Amino acid sequence: MKRTIAALTMVAVASAAENLIFNDDFNTFNLKTWEHELTLAGGGNWEFEWYVNNRSNSYVKDGVLYIKPTMTEDYIGTQALNSGSINIWGMSPAELCTGPQFYGCERSAAGSGNVNNPIRSARLRTVKSFSTKFGRVEVKAQLPKGDWLWPAIWMLPVSNEFGPWPASGEIDIMESRGNAPGYVAGGHDTFGSTLHWGTNYD
């Protein structure tokens, strides 16, 4: 099971010509460009993953960026997964939790009847290194196969200028699922794109 992004290009569209303003062919993994989110928040959807900055979950090889899920149990053990706590508030900037909402910096399975986030993966963003207002985005990607995988490529606002989500907007360039074709909500043979805006989700 793996997610890959082979290339990402951003082109500014002018009236007469297009100018390349951002490109990454992933010959190297530029961690100044690509910031890792560090959170247990599940994207506001109560997703299963724990987003980390670990080369087991995100790395570059032969011009390809790999985003790979791994089992949390292999990292913290069965007992901690089922009845322990995970605290990622961090003691240094490199380890600092980036998403405190939705209990994103600390989770506990102790006595709750729940388990801690069972999957570790990666979520990368350019919020501190690159943003643009207009242009065309081209992404070359191979989508994963596997139940419960949800690859997505989003454009999110740098700041909530018009208010909290969705008021400041969101462009979902691509979202898909790793499930087999025929899955009721769509499989890895389909994808969707969405625009979010307005005063509320409904």
What residues fall within each predicted segment?
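Sec-dependent signal peptide recognition
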Residues: 1-7
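GH16 jelly-roll
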Residues: 17-202
